[in-house]
């Protein structure tokens, strides 16, 4: 597991600003749940955490229990790429994704989002060399070797 650095997480959440207030959020490749839990602490209405790794799920559930989150939280043990095939734009306002770097997940998420939006907006963290040139036509913010890509669903 490669957790999002505090600096990147703070910049990410600050750039979401008031859009997070009352939002329905999905945290894909949730890992420890840091992004989704931060979204809840900043006013998200609900968060669905999607994680396939049993070890990460144990950590995620412990973190949720530690922070005392209530019924606005759901944990789904599933591969994120399979999960999004069944989600629709009306299901989530914001999708946060922090997939493993260098394995093609960031590209696959962006392509899937363009073909079938599974949220109103997608925010995906990836390494600076993880996207093909043809997939770089959206807002990107760089933090050293880390990039946050933001896409909006077409209306």
Positions of predicted regions on the chain:
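Class I S-adenosyl-L-methionine-dependent methyltransferase catalytic core
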Residues: 1-155
